[in-house]
Design a protein with these regions (language model features):
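Fe-S-dependent hydro-lyases/dehydratases of central metabolism
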Residues: 4-224
């Protein structure tokens, strides 16, 4: 999943915002809505996030001017043709059941590049990935004050090899973050600790502001 953030800015929607002597760039959907006579008060927040996502990630290939124009026209009932659009989520949320195989796949791709004499470290998640280990801890101890501590300790003993592998992944891959067992279920950790309303990312020495969006490897991941 790729965050382009190198927008062609065909609709001249990139704006600057100054806060405490710091300059931030962002993509203003209002600027484009005016060009299509679209009343944004009638557009749901979820679709506004998609509109901003398209403007910010316009690379001319995955997202181009025609695609963006079509979406804005459709929201104004001026384009009824069904089309696919691109979406680049800010981050990916995984739990251990789905996350461990994904890390193994990334490791396998690095090995494949190394075997071909290429630089293996170019293989990294292109969007932020948070892997929350929340499906593993078994209840061996209970009704004592340090039950959680003992259960987590036992979990590390049982699955030492897996945790060593995940620790290697966190140390080796860019944009990969690990939440250890005992911190909470992935949805709780996502809402309380990981999610932000607005993210800041530095591109070419310039800070960009954009809303949070997430794809989860669970059927009911919640987005702020």
């Amino acid at each position: 999943l790729l965050q382009v953030m190198n927008s062609k800015n065909s609709f001249k929607s990139e704006k600057a915002l100054n806060i405490d002597n710091n300059t931030y760039k962002y993509f203003d959907i209002n600027e484009v809505a005016k060009q299509f006579n679209l009343n944004l008060l009638q557009v749901p927040i979820s679709l506004k996030i998609l509109l901003e996502n398209l403007l910010r990630n316009e690379d001319g290939e995955s997202v181009n001017k025609d695609m963006i124009s079509s979406v804005f026209r459709s929201l104004n009932n001026n384009d009824n043709e069904k089309k696919e659009i691109s979406f680049f989520p800010t981050r990916v949320l995984m739990q251990d059941f789905t996350g461990v195989p994904a890390v193994a796949d990334l490791a396998a791709m690095r090995n494949a590049l190394k075997n071909r004499g290429l630089q293996p470290t170019i293989i990294n998640p292109l969007s932020r990935v948070d892997l929350v280990i929340d499906h593993s801890v078994m209840v061996d101890k209970y009704k004592i004050h340090n039950a959680l501590e003992q259960n987590v300790k036992k979990e590390f003993e049982r699955n030492k090899e897996r945790y060593e592998f995940l620790k290697w992944g966190q140390e080796s891959f860019n944009n990969f973050y690990l939440v250890p067992p005992g911190a909470g279920i992935c949805h709780q950790v996502n809402l309380e600790n990981i999610a932000k309303t607005i993210w800041i990312k530095e591109i070419n020495n310039q800070n960009y502001l954009f809303p949070d969006s997430v794809v989860g490897t669970d059927s009911h991941t919640t987005m702020v």
